[in-house]
Design a protein with these regions (language model features):
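N-terminal Rossmann-like FAD-binding beta1-loop-alpha1 element of flavoenzymes
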Residues: 11-40, 232-237
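Glycine-rich FAD pyrophosphate-binding loop
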Residues: 31-58, 248-255
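C-terminal, flexible cofactor-proximal segment of oxidoreductases
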Residues: 338-471
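Glycine-rich dinucleotide-binding loop and its adjacent helix/turn
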Residues: 110, 118-125, 133-135, 155, ...
Length: 471
């Protein structure tokens, strides 16, 4: 690949925003490169983990509707000695993917643990993974703003932070920045007819899954859940055992029959209009549901970067994608700025490692980027091909990304650095069957410690079968 600029990168100080899964892997790979004078990680919570750092108290700051990414960050849900920020996790949550492919390349989950770990298991795992980079983390420190300053051909980034324990403001300059703030902060609640008026008349009826914690809160209530992605189905399944029967599940596309049976809900079409007087909704087929006690939106989140709003051109418009990036990672005009963790429907931990391996090598000048024109052309082609689902990867798209980035990283001109993971045939097979395996895990009481216990056994390919056939 050609160089992005005639001058090499001059990166000595690196900032990492966020000590969640992507921020931790970034710190590890940057250290392993042995090319940077300092790596500093800013984390607003008092512990690592990002979304996995659970807050029992939910956020009550959701806007209804919420369709704009240009909204200030949530305040902490608990003030005092250690402010805590609301997590999108809920009390009883298990991963959607088995730990055997979810894990980082150099650390297994406990082999005697559940094959689909609980949220507490994952948080404990991340704390363990963080041990050799914790000294880099400035906890309870929130990034308030980040400004680009150019010195010749080199970019510099001025970052202003606030210590949330004593209110002290600080400003530091960095040569490169890893933006690993995650994308589960700003909720998405669509602007449906009369939703504002409904919310004003019936405050608290409309909520988002980010504020969901326990199903007992819905005991005896008439409930409508909106959305049938993984979290929507899981939450609906929990609530349906406590609320008035049947729980209503509003969807755009039908739920697979086996999954719907497990949820125990009645599937209905999309909401067309809110009915204020009836405390109800009119659905797209004309059906009316009245006297709703809870309408829970499981409709995802918007990409948002409140500390980077001065960067031009802007990174986001409607919050559905991030603009100006090469390979969903490098800012094309300012490649000392990277955004790991944007791909959706991928296994995030190993993907974040693959991304970190590449940008650590690029910034140390042992790996090059294509010319700006080529990177821009890639983004244009990708946008035309994927449309609105720009960051949404197809089935096994993460396996392809791991292969691509592993090959890219291992073409480095230096032997320094940490090698990113790739999946073998067994792991690719596990990636292919995880949806069916998770459903079986739920149906059998969330007790299984292996895929074999659930009836899934890998069969090695015969000589005439291709890897694709096996997957």
């Amino acid at each position: 690949m050609g160089s992005v600029r005639p001058e090499p990168f001059d990166v000595k100080k690196v900032a990492v925003i966020g000590a969640g899964p992507c921020g931790l892997s970034a710190a590890k790979y940057l250290l392993a490169q042995q090319a940077f004078e300092s790596v500093v990680v800013f984390e607003q919570n008092p512990e690592v983990g990002g979304v996995w750092y659970y807050s029992r108290q939910p956020s009550d700051n959701a806007q209804v509707p919420q369709v704009s990414p240009f909204y200030p960050p949530d305040p902490p849900v608990r003030s005092g000695d250690k402010p805590v920020f609301a997590s999108p996790m809920y009390e009883v949550l298990h991963t959607n993917i088995p730990w055997t492919i979810m894990k980082y390349g150099d650390l297994d989950f406990p082999h005697d643990g559940l094959i689909f770990p609980s949220r507490a298991d994952v948080q404990e795992y991340l704390v363990k993974y963080s041990q050799d980079v914790r000294h880099l983390v400035k906890f309870s420190t929130q990034v308030k703003s980040m400004t680009l300053r150019q010195e010749g051909l080199q970019d510099r980034w001025d970052i202003e932070t606030e210590n949330l324990l004593d209110g002290q403001q600080s400003k530091e300059t960095f040569d490169a920045v890893v933006v690993a703030n995650g994308h589960y902060a700003t909720t998405h609640i669509p602007d449906v007819k009369n939703i504002k008026e409904f919310n004003a008349a019936h405050p608290g009826v409309i909520t988002h899954s980010k504020s969901y914690r326990v199903p007992e809160d819905y005991a005896g209530k008439k409930v409508l859940v909106v959305g049938n992605a993984a979290s929507g189905l899981d939450i609906a399944s929990q609530i349906s055992r406590h609320c008035k029967s049947p729980l209503l599940l509003s969807v755009h596309e039908p739920t697979p029959e086996e999954n719907l049976a497990h949820v125990g809900a009645e599937e209905v079409p999309a909401i067309e209009e809110f009915l204020v007087e009836e405390r109800g909704v009119r659905l797209s087929n004309g059906r009316v549901e009245k006297d709703l006690d809870a309408i829970l939106y499981c409709t995802g989140y918007l990409f948002t970067f409140p500390f980077l709003e001065t960067l031009t051109p802007g990174l986001v418009s409607d919050g559905r994608r991030v603009y100006g990036l090469y390979k969903h990672l490098f800012h094309i005009d300012h490649p000392t700025l990277v955004f790991p963790g944007l791909p959706i429907r991928v296994v995030p931990f190993p993907v974040s490692e693959a991304q970190a391996a590449v940008f650590a090598r690029v910034w140390s000048n042992s790996l090059s980027l294509p010319p700006v024109e080529e990177m821009s052309r890639w983004e244009e082609d990708e946008a035309e091909r994927r449309g609105k689902a720009f960051h949404v990867f197809p089935k096994l798209g993460d396996a392809d990304l791991l292969d691509e980035f592993h090959e890219w990283a291992t073409n480095s001109s230096s032997e320094k650095g940490k090698e990113p993971p790739v999946w073998d045939n067994v792991q690719k097979w596990q990636r292919g069957i995880y949806v069916e395996a998770k459903l079986k895990f739920e149906l059998t009481g969330r007790k299984a410690k292996s895929l074999e216990e659930l009836g899934f056994t890998y069969q090695p390919p015969s000589e005439v079968e291709s890897e694709q056939d096996i997957v």
